[in-house]
Amino acid sequence: MAITLNLWTHESSLFPNDAVLNYDLVPSAKPGDIFEIRAQNGDEIALQHNHSSTGKLHAKREKEPVYLMPSPLTDDLKRRHPNLQLSVVSHISSLLNIKNREPVVVKICEDKTNLEAEHVVIFFRDQFISRSDMWKLFRELCGKCVYLKQRVSFIGDVPGEIRCIWRKGKKCHSAYISERTKPIFRSESARFLIFIQMSEEMWHFEEDGELNYNKAIDGFLPDLFSFWRDLGTHHLVSIILFTRVEYSHHGPMCVWQPRSQKNSEKGSSIYPQNSFNASIDNEGGPYEDFFKVVVDNVSSRDWQPVLANLKLELAKFRQDVIVRKIKDENGREIEYICGRMTGSQEGNFLEVINMAVFQFQSDYIDRDLSRTGTSIIIVTPGTGLYEVNEKMLHLTSKSLLNTVVGMDIVSLGKVPLFLTPIVRYKNPVKNKKRSQLTSRISSSVSPSNVIPNSLTSSVSNFSVSSFLNNLKEDTEWLYTFPIGCNISFYSTTEMRSLRSPWENLMREHQFEPTAKMHELQMMGVLEAESAKISIPLLQSDPLLKGSVFSEEVQEDYDERQFTGEAAVSANDVLSSSSPRHFSSHTPVNVDKSSYLEMNGHSLSTVISGKESISSFGAKVDDLKSTSKESARQFGKSALTERLQKLAGNSSNVSSSLQTSSSNKSSLLTKKSSFPALLKGFLALPATVTTSANPLGFKSTIQRPIPIKNNEDSDSCKAFSQAPPIATKKPPTFLKPNSPEYAKTVIPKSSTNLENEYQTPWKIIQNPFKLKETTADNDPVSLRWEHLYMKVQDVRKFNWLSMCTPGALPLTFSYFPSEEELNDKFEEYTYTIGIDPEFTQMNQQELLAEMICQRLSRGYQIVVNPAAAVSYSGNPKANKAGTITDFSRSVNNQRNGHLTVGSDAVCLSLGDSQFHRLSCDSVGYNIEVKRYVKKVSGQGKMRYDYNFWSKNECKYVKSNITFSANDSANYNWNYVDQLICGFETYLPDSVKYWRARFVLLPMSTTSTHVFQKYQLLDHADALSDEEFRVEGIYKLSELLYKGKIDPMNDSNNKTPNTSPAELLGIKFTTLPMAQYIHSELEALRLDSSRNEQSLFMPNKRLDCSADLHTIAKEIQGPGGPKIDDITWHYRIYENCFLGSEFVSWLANTFIGINTREEALKYGNKLLSLGLFDHALKKHPLLDGYYVYRISPDYSIKPVSNRPYRSWFSRKKDSGQKHLDNKIITESEAGPSRLELSRRILFNADVEKKNGKSETVTVHYDLLHNPASCYHIRIEWLLATASVIEKLLQSWSRILERYGLKLVEAPIHEIAAVGELNPFDQVSIISLALDPPPIPERAPLVNDPVNYSKNWWNVKILEHFDFILDTEAASTFPKSITAVYSWGKPNFRYVQYIHRTGTVLVQIDDDQRFLWLPNRLHNSKVSKLSFTKSNKSTLNPNLKETAEELERKFREFCSNKDELDQFYGIVNHASDDRRSIYSSASTHASNASADDASNVNV
């Protein structure tokens, strides 16, 4: 029953709920009911006001209702707002189109199933959300009502917004989320890789007179960037140009010699093998692949300079690829045009996909927490048709199954008459038989009639019938769909949208070719009416039982042609084996004889690539039939006579057909043209673009009658089966990932059953025919099925996917039958138990975490119970249910309606792996059954290519080894043990998420830090370096606060010890090699150095003790460590640190229980003269500050000087090479040097989440304030958004102390090419060799490695670079230096710029390896633009990586500047401080005095 209530609006800050309702006004309602809320219509308003339903009341339009589940009004709100009936947020009222305090009609909805949403689309940006987080978010939404523009929250954050809801096949404003709803997640902050295929067709004109590459540069890309800008997306874009250059077998490869008349007369004899190493294609021809990075990780908002640069690169791309400089016999370099660009069909399509996917196989390394998703866009002038290598196809399919990367193909051509995208490869079974047939036919060809380098030859002695029989058995090519690819045709959709509606209406009634015809493109306007246009011949489908050449089929066709049954669907379209296929809007009254004459010229057009050849023996005039009866009389005898006539005249054709090797089609083979003519329905790259009348021209389909080809090259006789000439209505073109698309797959024939285990794809026997088969014939195509709400029409451009790429759906609707599981899969079973001592989760929570881990690895939840057959044969026993069946089970368990043992969840990785997780009835165990498909070995392929990186100025040869991830051997048992808590160590095989961060010293310090020292009246006494050291102490406090002790021995923690001491962090100003040397020397001289005791000392002193007693205790065995402390090459003898002294006071004196009390008492002792600061500069501070016992209380004699120089140490002849001697005799010292430690850390500091967000944090034990401090975070079970919030909190806190938190790559930059083939370092050399090192340079302990880079280091310091990571060779061989994550593995020393934008290494040849820090630059670029596309960066941060590189290159290439720099450094070498002040002018803002007095 509907009631009327007054609707109030409120802001989300007032009420936490989107809707609140006074349930007292609706007695039959209860919390949890769904209410339909709609605005009143005109009649209801009139009835309420006693008015007639006339006038303006009828003008009030009835809006779509909104479905909500309002929360009950609390008693407090009832008292404060007694008149409140129903209140919603303002956005819901805008959906209803009503204002505040207006009446609405409210009705309870009894049946929730009618309100269920089929799909709900959630958009998010500027954050990384894993697929496991997506599932958790959807579980929270399940059982609730959602509405458009609703902000959904997850763990306290707002990760996304609902922008689209589908219910009953239509969009709606609101709906109910049930377990059957399919969520779709789309990212507005993804990474895009845009590949532009620069094939031969890129420089071809379309019918509209526009070049293809102009469509890409002036059409598609500007539109794409404009959409991104309008949507406010924050994508990261890289654009790569690629092509394949083929070098012909026949004749010379160099066709142009512009600078050598002499060589031009002789003819070139230079072949590609003489100048470079080319790969060999499937046909045995040499080729090379080229890649050029034009844009590298640029923000999507900064697109105007990107397009300007791209146009320049496109203009010179062809010249850079095919023009070679080759030395002649005189040693002169001559430019030659070598080879030709292949067509799009023969391009390196799969190689591009593999190179893109290769870098994403390790996306768990250097995880960017501000972006989600990766999308690949391939812009091609072709139609999405590719010839590939079978082994490469197998490797690519495996790689795509193991990744969650989406891929879109943008075709600049027209929609073809076959399904795309599609790939084909040689049939390994029939290829041998085909080669034998080719040799037989070639042997019968007269050599005198064969034209060299031509595609024509004389007719063989084979009869027509024998040739047709050979065609019927032809299965040379096998076809399949690439996994996870979508295709959109830009020319037939977006160009239409740029025209006015009137122009579009007029074009619907105009002739529009559905295939590219060379004659039509080349003729003038006046020639269009009289010219003859030839199209290719027909060929039967060899895989079908019948043949269009049979009398029965021909007669049936003739009968249907004139009985109104000619209009057939695309299902009746047969494949064509001609190198091209055409379709034309031919009038209905054109009879068969006229069509035969047009086809009589077709093959000549295809082969020659020029104008139509007219020398066909007896020329036949065009015939026009005006009578249906005369057409019926054209029967078998006429066809036979015509075929014989054409066969007799074909010999006259061959002499007139000539094509040069440079103009030969890329689809045709190099050695023999026979296989090329049998390749199938494909078009030549020069005219590969086809169309299927996308504007809907109405006419009747005419199936042409096949005739004999009158031009037979080595292939003897080629027949083709033509596509429809005209269409009554445009056929339905489907996206490859839609369910209907999967139904087009034909089951494998018996000849291919032996390869069923080895191929992860399904064979398509006829791409022209849409066979109605079951969807489970191609389960791989269903992997992306649930990303689409309806059938995808390929003629509609998929802007949604290219602007906001969708994540891999969480659900999958395929599960193998019991027979398939037994025959094609291997089973692995293990059980995970719950031990309350280690596991703090119950069975359901453990099951949820196990599902999350599998979802994050690309698995999907099986939601098709009909296809899931259990092992016992009962379809219901293994019912995986829907995506939230498990979630619903958890809710039911809380309500007491669940038997735990009934839970069973199935997950799938494509159709290759299936996991079944089932709970036992006890509630402590989970059984895991893994089914791994029996496949052949993974295999590897080496790929050689030429690469032009963004940092280079030429192509450089490179290679990469492709290999699919061996996901079948992933150790899921160990991962499940980690989830249970039985294991804490993360091996590399687990592929856990990891990221490295560095703390860089900033030039300014926040004024907020001074507040800590204002009470001591020493705010102006701390230098910038001292504040940065305080920042490290603050970080140690943060780490210690969130530290997790798995043994729960928190009682053993010492509250009176500083966190830095407890974490073992030490400070030094010496380089690593010098620090190791000093430590070894100190250990040799004093073997009884104090070590931290495992036992807590007993408090034994009272605060009333006299100063002599306290001084004796300080200098005794139980006192703070007193040692010689080195700081900035100054040695402070017999000193102790302030933090250690405060800890000693708190642990020694009775009545002191906190560090604050100890600090206060210590300052009292300082004021009494017991000790003092080494430079008499600071009071007692709890940090890294140096203090010394006063001479009156010191046991050891104390020098009057506060310090002595580190360089003043005397070295005798026996100690001259002390460094090497100490290292070689280090048996007495430590054999293991620990550089970092790891702790388990709870990232959820605020504890908003119900569970512990455990991560592993690695931190440095040794820190030099002049270099970086490193933090490494690793996680497997934690939520990425929680970690991002933690890092943001750390960044805000540490910036107050002059430290900047920057993400940096884990691997050294010299090895970046091993992870990302499109990323290479830039090498910068010095134009002038540096002079010898000054004599007064600092003493070094590794002169072999350190001294040779001394000048390089000075140059880097001059440009504000600081030390990042030492090289592995820095550490002595006698010492085992280890990090908590492994041994040092950097080959070269690495530096980083103070801004964090650039990383540099120094190689063995004293060259600089330069690489921008893209992990940091991408975040800066995201924040550097407002919505108006104006830069908001601080002026100090505008120096980009490109500008830094330009200045650095200019400096290194300028001999005068280098010579001046060397002179300044040499002249200042007498005073080390002058060296640093002159060589580090830009490196530090601190004065020389500050640098010498820091922290002392």
Curated annotation (Swiss-Prot):
This is Vacuolar membrane-associated protein iml1. Its main location: membrane. It is a peripheral membrane protein. Gene3D superfamilies: Winged helix-like DNA-binding domain superfamily/Winged helix DNA-binding domain (1.10.10.10). Keywords: Membrane, Phosphoprotein, Vacuole. It comes from the Eukaryota. Belongs to the IML1 family. InterPro entries: DEP_dom, DEPDC5_CTD, IML1, IML1_N, WH-like_DNA-bd_sf, WH_DNA-bd_sf. The gene is iml1. Residues 1116-1191 form the DEP domain. GO terms for molecular function: GTPase activator activity. The keyword Phosphoprotein applies. One of its GO terms (biological process) is negative regulation of TORC1 signaling. The modification Phosphoserine is found at S738. GO terms for cellular component: fungal-type vacuole membrane; GATOR1 complex; vacuolar membrane. It is found in: Vacuole membrane.
